[in-house]
Regions:
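Hydrophobic alpha-helical transmembrane segments and their immediately adjacent juxtamembrane loops
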Residues: 202-294
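Long amphipathic alpha-helical coiled-coil segments
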Residues: 179-191, 216-227
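Peripheral, non-transmembrane regulatory/ligand-interaction domains of membrane transport proteins
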Residues: 1-187, 196, 200-203, 207-210, ...
């Protein structure tokens, strides 16, 4: 039973069969509202029906065994005196708003609740964007030290940047549009708050764009470092091969089993040959060092 004397908020997990059945059977909703609250679409969306608004907003996923960029859809049906929201996975933002209500300092109207939930979703998104920013700074410091970061770390951060931006961009437009809707239950203070939230989302989007650009530069630097390391190893192997090439030639030449090889009858010929190889290797090393090849 929904109280009629004051604004009410009903929050459901539509993955629960009982909640889904209630949403399908309640006379409070029309077919469009049911489809919105139970549908599969996850993109931010705003549909106005008179003084009623249907919203789909997205929040950062903090659930265990899920990645943050797998954003959670919060579906909202809101009227001047009634709010119905549903989601499949929990959101910290909804808990923030609920906690404020429990403490007695939360929303007192549908408009206040709408501003608070948009604000909470934006704050949580901003926290995650700042975390990504810090991770990029850490990678930049590693690369500046001419070291290679852990394999796949940059690719994961870049993917998160792109996916978060994919949902925050339409959500920014949605909040700005919501502030301009001529709804009787939204006053000027509420509209200013929503426009401020849209502006904060725009700043987070700018940070995400900058993060994508910086990650591209980092990828180039990491590729350059990898190429340099590969070239350095190949060069070292080439120098080693150059040093052993004369020795390989001489050992092959003197190793043939033919008569008339110089020193074949001398007991000291082997040591003389080893000394000659050592002198040749030393001379070649000095020459390479002089030519700055080594």
């Amino acid at each position: 039973e929904i109280p009629a004397a004051q604004p009410s908020w009903v929050h459901l997990d539509y993955g629960n069969p009982e909640s889904a059945r209630w949403l399908l059977q309640t006379p409070l909703l029309n077919d469009a509202a049911r489809e919105s609250l139970l549908g599969q679409s996850n993109r931010p969306k705003l549909v106005r029906m008179g003084e009623t608004v249907l919203l789909i907003l997205r929040g950062i996923n903090h659930n265990k065994d899920h990645r943050p960029e797998e954003m959670v859809a919060l579906r909202i049906y809101i009227t001047p005196d009634f709010i119905l929201s549903s989601r499949r996975r929990s959101l910290l933002s909804e808990k923030d708003v609920f906690q404020q209500l429990v403490l007695g300092g939360g929303a007192i109207s549908s408009a206040d609740w709408l501003v608070e939930i948009c604000d909470a979703l934006t704050d949580r998104a901003g926290e995650f964007v700042e975390e990504l920013h810090d991770q990029i700074l850490e990678l930049e410091e590693i690369v500046l030290m001419r070291e290679l970061p852990a394999n796949g770390r940059l690719a994961r951060i870049r993917k998160q940047l792109i996916m978060i931006r994919r949902y925050l961009s339409p959500q920014r437009d949605l909040v700005a549009r919501l502030a301009n809707e001529k709804l009787s239950w939204l006053d000027e203070d509420d509209r200013r708050c929503l426009l401020d939230i849209a502006d904060r989302l725009r700043r987070w989007l700018d940070d995400l764009d900058a993060g994508v650009a910086r990650s591209a530069v980092l990828a180039d630097e990491i590729n350059n470092l990898t190429a340099e390391a590969t070239n350095r190893r190949a060069y070292q192997m080439s120098v080693m091969a150059l040093m052993f090439l004369p020795a390989s030639f001489l050992t092959g030449l003197f190793g043939i089993n033919l008569g008339g090889i110089p020193g074949a009858e001398s007991p000291t010929a082997f040591w003389v040959f080893c000394g000659s190889l050592l002198a040749l290797a030393t001379g070649l090393a000095v020459w390479l060092k002089y030519r700055r090849w080594w």
